[in-house]
Design a protein with these regions (language model features):
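Membrane-embedded alpha-helical bundles that constitute the cytochrome b-like, heme-associated redox core
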Residues: 1-217
Length: 217
């Protein structure tokens, strides 16, 4: 049982390091893309196509950005399952667990806000359909729609709003949550090692007391 828990803790830590690596990879490639990307309706598609075809290694950077973003979500979901199987009811585990869930939701948010950034036909109509679903949410649907679109039709303002949310708010949040997540796991590992050392010390002390009692008798 202890070996099983040890493997799960090690796997959780490895996945957490992978999550941070993917977050940094997505952030760095996103910054490189932002030098040439134009968050303007009608020109967003052309700018991305120009990056892919004219900029040296542009297609590679664009592909790495997409793959890292998708891999982040998959890795975070696997991480949640691993942490659930090896759950320890302590504050460090709870910190890692909650930050892991929030990180997964942030990754999904990053993926969702990117669907219209290329201003393709597929992305445009998919966003329109999902925007209707958001608008149907009671009480806050209209407000959310105005935040995303800028209060009007789906146009340049919408692209600019989603670009800001994607590139600044969610990206910074993802990196921060990944760091908190790893910190929680490392704290849990530290606590487990401390408990193990304490248990060994107590066992040795008891053994010494028994040996001393046997010597006296």
């Amino acid at each position: 049982m202890k070996s099983y828990e040890f493997v799960l803790r090690r796997l959780a830590t490895i996945l957490s390091v992978a999550i941070i690596s993917l977050s940094v990879m997505a952030a760095v490639t996103g910054i490189l893309l932002s030098f040439y990307y134009e968050p303007v309706a009608g020109r967003a598609y052309q700018s991305l196509n120009w990056i892919d075809t004219e900029i040296p290694n542009g297609l590679l950077i664009h592909s790495i950005h997409d793959i890292a973003g998708n891999a982040l979500i998959v890795t975070a979901l696997i991480q949640i399952v691993v942490m659930f199987l090896g759950r320890q009811f302590r504050s460090s585990w709870l910190t890692a667990w909650i930050s892991g869930i929030l990180l997964t939701l942030t990754g999904i948010g990053l993926s969702w806000t990117a669907i219209i950034l290329d201003w393709s036909q597929v992305g445009y109509w998919r966003f329109r359909i999902e925007l209707s679903t958001i608008e149907a949410i009671p009480f806050i649907g209209g407000t959310l729609r105005n935040i995303l679109t800028g209060g009007g039709a789906v146009n340049t303002t919408t692209v600019a709003h989603l670009y800001t949310i994607h590139s600044y708010l969610l990206s910074v949040g993802a990196i921060a949550l990944a760091i908190v997540h790893l910190w929680g796991l490392l704290q849990q590992e530290k606590e487990m090692k401390g408990n193990a050392v304490e248990a060994v010390a107590k066992s040795e002390k008891l053994q010494q007391q028994r040996n001393f009692s046997q010597t006296l008798s």
